[in-house]
Amino acid sequence: MGNSFSSVRDTLAHILGAEWIWLERWQGRSPKALLDPAAFPTAQSLKSRWETVERDQLQFIEALTPQRLSEELPYINQKGQRYSYPLWQQLIHVVNHSSYHRGQVTTLLRQLGAEAVSTDFLVYFDEKTKSQR
């Protein structure tokens, strides 16, 4: 369908895998591979793992200090190459990466005739606030 990945599931698994691998890197580990999309045969299995990664991300982010955000954080990518960037830049990279692929998911859903949800950040907060009333 002219996308980076062959399906909605594979695209979502890629987003999840990238968020997971970056969290691992921020904690001093450098996994050699992303999560395998085949490990998520159902939407529920993907959602369950995503909830775990999201919880772990939140714990990590809540503990950050301004000093920690500005520190250079080295990591080794999947090809074995070493890199180092300030943590704040890595965080922005992950947000941008996920946003890019969420846009692809939206396009795929529309091509499949499904109604796509909004990926706007502020719309998310508006809806979240309304649901908490």
Where are these regions (language model features)?
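Short acidic-hydrophobic surface loop/beta-edge motif
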Residues: 73-75
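Helix-adjacent hinge/juxtasegments
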Residues: 29-70
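Short, contiguous alpha-helical
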Residues: 1-36, 78-133
